[in-house]
Structures are given as C-alpha cells and as structure tokens.
C-alpha cells in the first residue's frame, strides 16, 4: 500500500534536552510539501557535530531529531519536484545548493543562503516542521534530521546517487568523508610534495589525511592525544604521528622544529579554540595555510595578533569540504564506486538504530571512528 500523501508513523531518536540520552520515540512524519522529498533512511553515521548539540556546545532548537550523515531511498515527493523520484537512492545534504543565490552562482564557496547552520531555526526552508511526537511539534536539525526511519528534506538539499551504491558505506560521504577529504583537496588545495599536519584523528580528520595523500603531500603529520588512532592514521596515509602529551613544549613549536619553520598546510579537525590556534601557529609564517574544519564551541571567540597573518599565512575554513553539495556529493559517490578510495577503514562499528546511545558512548570514549546505524 502506498504511503505517498499520508502521515507516516515510525521510530525516531528524539533529543528532548541537552546532556540527556536520545529517546527512541514513535513519531509522525507529515507528507512532503511542494519542492520537498520524504526519504526512508537506510543507514546513518554518528558525527561529532551531533554530539556537540547533545553537550550544548552547538546550540540548536530542541526538542529535535538530530542526524545529518546518512543515505536512504526516496519514499515520495512533493509537488514540483523534478530531480528525484520514489525509489531513487539519495544522500540528504546539511548544506543545500539552491542554485539561485549569489553563493551558488559563484564558482567559489558553497555556503548556500538556504542553510540552517548559521542561525538554526530547526525547520525546513519554509519555516515549518514535519515531525510530531507526543502531540508536540519536533524541530529539524540542519534540514536533514536523519535519526529517524523517515525524514523530509527540501529538494535542493538532496543528492541523487548511483543506484548500485552500498548505502551503509556511502552514508559517510554525507558529512564525514566529504568534509575532511574536501578540506584538503578543495579548501587548502594541498600541493604535491608539501608538508601537512592534521589535528584530530576522528572520521573527519582521517578523511583529511586521505585527502592530503590523494593530493600528493610528501609528509602528513597526524596529531592526536589518543595513540590508539595512530595505526589507522598511518594505514590511511600519515607518515608520522605525534601526541602533544609526549612533549613539554607547545605542539606548534614541536611541529615547526620538525618541518624547518612550519608546515605548508594544517587542518584543525577537533573544534577547540586552543587547537585552532596551535594549527595556525604551526603553519609556516610566510606561506602556510591553516584550515578550520572542526565546529567551534558556541559563542566563543579567538583573539590573535594580526602580525601572524601579515607575514603571509592564510587562515580559512569551509563546510562540507568546500563541495557544492548537489554537484559534489554524487561525484564523490561515483569515485567511491570506481574504487578511487575506500571507506571501510573509517567504519569501525555497525549497530542497529535502536542502539544509538551506545554508538554515542563509543564516540565519546574514543573507541570508534565512525559508527553506522542501520534501520
């Protein structure tokens, strides 16, 4: 029996308040409105950004259904939708590509004005919500809300992908892999023979290591306080791994000594102000580029000496690895299908969706790189 045009009742993980576990609830998911798509989720990755909301470091309206790194199958479409149809395999996009705004029309940048990242409303683009639980409307998260068996997204925030794609793997391209890999190849534009440093060896950081290797970096120095992640980093391309806790001097000084004055490219993939500064300071003062990849804590600021930039450093950042989402994500999936890279090393745990809290515990304890939840 077709569910198109009807309210769907299903299971979802609702975050009712910060610093509390997710609650598996029965929710109602309304049909898609015009230019919207309802998706049956198949697999979803657990990303540190979701945990930033749980901890309160990233403010987003609650109660909400979080989740943004996922893959699924189109269940139904709203009026006017032309780019996907029921049955298509898709990846929801936490940064849309409307194709009409100044950013989308420019060859540079990908931060479409339709995003719900800067000042999150917790709604779809028309300002309304599609989830109800216990008689209450539930907020969306960055326009995706993939911790649910069904979700509704705007058409400009969904990417159709190869019909043969293994969704339990390519879901990582929905955030972690694309963000890290793209930070190296698109944002920093790592050059052959260069020296790179990557701070943070979670799923995004390791993807940045993979991007540096793909771009031809000669040295890739991986930095983390969890030595258990070093073997995986070397497997994926790191040439050296260092633990800041092994040194008495600041890690940026260690890196400068190791690299004749500083690295060519550095990446902060943690989301801490102190490591953002260390990442900036470790790149060469005359020609280094430092990229902010990790999501910073809410309402916190960095203060720097402008001389650090006047000498020639470049300090930049980007979401989604600089990919224009609707164009870039399907191409990455195609590259994966062509075996240009593997995602297997990033997926350390696969759990049923109902064990979402266990998956977050693995993340917080440093025991996992990426946990994929299956529906």
From Swiss-Prot:
Modified residues (Phosphoserine): 23
Chain positions recorded as NAD(+) binding sites: 200-205, 224, 229, 293-295, 370
Function: Catalyzes the NAD-dependent oxidation of all-trans-retinol and its derivatives such as all-trans-4-hydroxyretinol and may participate in retinoid metabolism. In vitro can also catalyze the NADH-dependent reduction of all-trans-retinal and its derivatives such as all-trans-4-oxoretinal. Catalyzes in the oxidative direction with higher efficiency. Has the same affinity for all-trans-4-hydroxyretinol and all-trans-4-oxoretinal.
Compartments (UniProt record): Cytoplasm
A Pfam family matched in the record: ADH_N
Subunit structure: Homodimer or heterodimer of closely related subunits.
Tissues expressing the protein: Expressed in liver.
Cofactor mode of binding and number, as noted: Binds 2 Zn(2+) ions per subunit.
InterPro entries for the chain: ADH-like_C, ADH-like_N, ADH_Zn_CS, GroES-like_sf, NAD(P)-bd_dom_sf, PKS_ER
EC number assigned by the record: 1.1.1.105
Enzyme's top EC category: oxidoreductase
Protein name per its UniProtKB record: All-trans-retinol dehydrogenase [NAD(+)] ADH1B
One Gene Ontology cellular component: cytosol
Catalytic activity: all-trans-retinol + NAD(+) = all-trans-retinal + NADH + H(+); all-trans-4-hydroxyretinol + NAD(+) = all-trans-4-hydroxyretinal + NADH + H(+); all-trans-4-oxoretinol + NAD(+) = all-trans-4-oxoretinal + NADH + H(+)
Main location: cytoplasm
Cofactor(s), names only, from the UniProt record: Zn(2+)
Gene Ontology biological process: retinoic acid metabolic process; retinoid metabolic process; retinol metabolic process
Disulfide bonds, paired cysteine numbers: none
Annotated family: Belongs to the zinc-containing alcohol dehydrogenase family.
Protein keywords: Acetylation, Cytoplasm, Lipid metabolism, Metal-binding, NAD, Oxidoreductase, Phosphoprotein, Zinc
Keyword Lipid metabolism: yes
Any one GO molecular function term: all-trans-retinol dehydrogenase (NAD+) activity
Keyword RNA-binding listed: no
Residues reported to bind Zn(2+) 2: 98, 101, 104, 112
Organism: Papio hamadryas
